[in-house]
Amino acid sequence: MGELPLDINIQEPRWDQRTFLGRARHFFTVTDPRNLLLSGAQLEASRNIVQNYRAGIVTPGLTEDQLWRAKYVYDSAFHPDTGEKVVLIGRMSAQVPMNMTITGCMLIFYRKTPTVVFWQWLNQSFNAVVNYSNRSGDAPITVRQLGMAYVSATTGAVATALGLKSLTKHLPPLVGRFVPFAAVAAANCINIPLMRQRELQVGIPVTNEQGQRLGHSVAAAKKGIFQVVISRICMAIPAMAIPPVIMDTLEKKDFLKRRPWLGAPLQMGLVGFCLVFATPLCCALFPQRSSIHVSRLEPELRAQIQEQNPSIEVVYYNKGL
């Protein structure tokens, strides 16, 4: 076997990101919870393999599959811009187990006001850690912006949950089970735009097909943020809509009536099962490198592009996660 060539592009995902299947395979790998079990030594070994390869040094005996594995392990634990190790619960691989626990508890403890407030607060605290850990190096989040988004999203989630909780008192019990989902959806609509408010003020970079930067666009930022909000809400739908329906049916059966202690672990398991698939599949709904027609850009930027590159009809931007 010959030495591994140096022309493998590990700056990009392994699979074609222009197709939904390629994006789904990428995010199934990125969100794999098993990466959380890797030791510090294994993470450092993967970092060394990746950094050496980028520097033109191939680890002896390294195969292409091992290189890609090291790349995804490295990406799962280290910030792409700063190179710092991301705190454990802020990693993409922590999304499924952390959301399983928090979402499961939101669905279990939805009846009493103190528990509703606590779990909505904890969910937004976790979101703040994830957003800060995965902040962009191109448009960094300040502590003030983080705090404003955190307080606003928590207030919005709690207000929505408590408001709907009072409205559903006289409705069938099943309706009350969907209150946590409505609160999470409302919080996403508040949290993500606030977290990315700088992008809404100054725009995000747009490029041509070759990746050459053409300017900054607020229109592209709005489209990217909208796509992320939709993805996040869709991500929550299976885990917060399917288990309540199943549990409402099962709780009327003798099996659970005789074994009420099974309700909580069963609901948690259903949430986890939904999230294992919903998280990567909903991350893959829109391409990470999305496109927008030049005609939808700001007049100044559109005129600048048409003057310098009249043949360009579509530009590209990173939508974020």
From Swiss-Prot:
Compartment(s) of residence: Mitochondrion membrane
A Pfam family assignment: SFXNs
Membrane-traversing stretches: 146-164, 174-194, 226-246, 266-286
Swiss-Prot/TrEMBL GO biological process terms: mitochondrial transmembrane transport; one-carbon metabolic process; serine import into mitochondrion
GO molecular function: L-serine transmembrane transporter activity; monoatomic ion transmembrane transporter activity; transmembrane transporter activity
InterPro entries xrefs: Mtc
Keyword match Membrane: yes
Alphabetized UniProt keyword annotations: Acetylation, Amino-acid transport, Membrane, Mitochondrion, One-carbon metabolism, Transmembrane, Transmembrane helix, Transport
Main location, first listed in the record: mitochondrion
Modified residue annotations for N-acetylmethionine: 1
Topological relation to the membrane, as annotated: Multi-pass membrane protein
Chemical reaction(s) catalysed: L-serine(in) = L-serine(out)
GO cellular component term, pick one: mitochondrion
Its job: Mitochondrial serine transporter that mediates transport of serine into mitochondria, an important step of the one-carbon metabolism pathway. Mitochondrial serine is converted to glycine and formate, which then exits to the cytosol where it is used to generate the charged folates that serve as one-carbon donors.
Sequence similarity: Belongs to the sideroflexin family.
Stated name of the protein: Sideroflexin-3
Species annotation: Bos taurus
